[in-house]
């Protein structure tokens, strides 16, 4: 299984004379001790509990320039390693190839569900909305930011009468209750294997847990109203962490039930302008923080300690990513946990916000994909184009090239082929 979780606006790494605040101090082994001592001031230290399962990859770059908008061009290339369209251009530019999640879904997904799970959390301001998942050239896949909608698709109740769905919502009736007779008949079949029974039980047990989270009460109305008044719209910023965690829970659930083999989660829109509230403090708009000024352009008053605030947001994304790792670790398999059988990837569509660089794109991987990836390591890919990163992930997922060897041809054909050997166990 594979999931890409995308953060916007680059990370607070060394750039334009700013200090390093994202990566560990030294290449090589990553341990819980190092992340809680010498590297405790770095954003990746939020993942210290999973140090032995981490693979941190620096030294990759996008292969092509943007076309009038750094954010759009970065989003176009992030999961596609494809060129950016000539037309449309600017903030409307599109990728000229399929995305890695699309390739995985076509090769590995169950026949009943050929599409990747494409999720979203946060605002859609309209300037640049979805950026990640492509069926092919200029064919951008829409993302779902409604956890209830995603949930009903996963458990297959989208065709239920509206009154039944409303009953589930209003009365918190369990879906298990609605199909209990069918469940009992299925579980009692003599030809059902033990593994199938275990998978079904995981499915049934997880339903109630997710229902409780999906149907929980929102924060008090006065708190939401205060955020709405400050932000000027409907409270999406105040809920972004909550919705992100719900979507992550659904990704883990979908993997555990083999609903899909691959998912993407885009947090925030193309130039994420969320005002994050962290530890009770509401920060300026994230996009402006990444520019270091109170502006979405190149002129404005400086934001005090802007890189420090960017670092705080990086840490928040690290905490959210850890939540996903926690959820994937909840599900046991024959050889360990669902995380061990997967690779979860925290990524970005820029290297650093202040320069909008397409160099040194951060990839934070967790899970070895069944032992393929070399974990507990921080490696430098050597300034290669990031198609080689995706080739390595595709190979970890069991895909091959036409000769039966590691995938080496993902992305635009102008890019050099190959994998990143340092990532492979």
Segments (PLM) and residue ranges:
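Ligand-binding pockets and gating/stacking loops
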Residues: 1-425
């Amino acid at each position: 299984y594979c999931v890409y979780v995308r953060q916007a606006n680059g990370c607070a790494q060394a750039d334009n004379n700013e200090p390093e605040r994202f990566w560990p101090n030294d290449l090589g082994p990553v341990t819980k001790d190092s992340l809680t001592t010498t590297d405790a001031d770095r954003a990746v230290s939020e993942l210290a509990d999973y140090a032995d399962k981490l693979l941190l990859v620096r030294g990759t770059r996008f292969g092509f320039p943007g076309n009038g908008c750094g954010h759009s061009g970065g989003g176009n290339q992030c999961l596609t390693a494809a060129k950016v369209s000539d037309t449309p251009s600017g903030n409307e530019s599109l990728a000229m190839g399929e995305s890695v999640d699309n390739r995985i879904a076509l090769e590995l997904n169950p026949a009943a569900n050929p599409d990747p799970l494409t999720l979203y959390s946060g605002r859609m301001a309209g300037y640049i909305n979805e950026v990640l998942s492509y069926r092919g050239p200029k064919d951008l896949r829409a993302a779902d930011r409604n956890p209830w909608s995603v949930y009903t698709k996963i458990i297959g109740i989208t065709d239920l009468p509206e009154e039944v769905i409303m009953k589930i919502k209003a009365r918190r009736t369990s879906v298990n209750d609605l199909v209990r007779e069918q469940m009992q008949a299925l579980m009692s079949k003599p030809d059902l294997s033990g593994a199938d029974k275990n998978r079904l039980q995981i499915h049934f047990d997880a339903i109630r847990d997710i229902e409780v989270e999906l149907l929980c009460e929102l924060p008090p109305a006065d708190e939401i109203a205060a955020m709405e008044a400050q932000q000027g719209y409907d409270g999406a910023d105040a809920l972004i962490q909550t919705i992100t965690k719900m979507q992550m829970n659904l990704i883990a659930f979908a993997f555990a039930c083999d609903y899909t083999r691959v998912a993407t989660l885009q947090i925030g829109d193309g130039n994420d302008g969320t005002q994050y509230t962290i530890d009770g403090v509401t920060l300026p708009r994230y996009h402006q923080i990444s520019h270091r000024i109170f502006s979405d352009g190149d002129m404005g008053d400086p934001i005090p300690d802007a890189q420090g605030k960017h670092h705080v947001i990086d840490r928040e994304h690290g905490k959210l990513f850890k939540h996903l790792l926690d959820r994937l670790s909840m599900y046991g398999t024959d050889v360990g946990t669902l995380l061990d059988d997967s690779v979860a990837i925290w990524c970005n569509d820029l290297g650093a916000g202040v320069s909008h660089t397409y160099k040194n794109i951060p990839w934070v991987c967790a899970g070895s994909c069944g032992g393929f990836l070399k974990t507990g390591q921080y490696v430098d890919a050597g300034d290669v184009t990031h198609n080689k990163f995706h080739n390595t992930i595709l190979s970890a997922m069991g895909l091959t090239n036409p000769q039966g060897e590691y995938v080496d041809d993902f992305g635009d054909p102008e890019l050099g082929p190959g994998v990143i050997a340092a990532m492979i166990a």
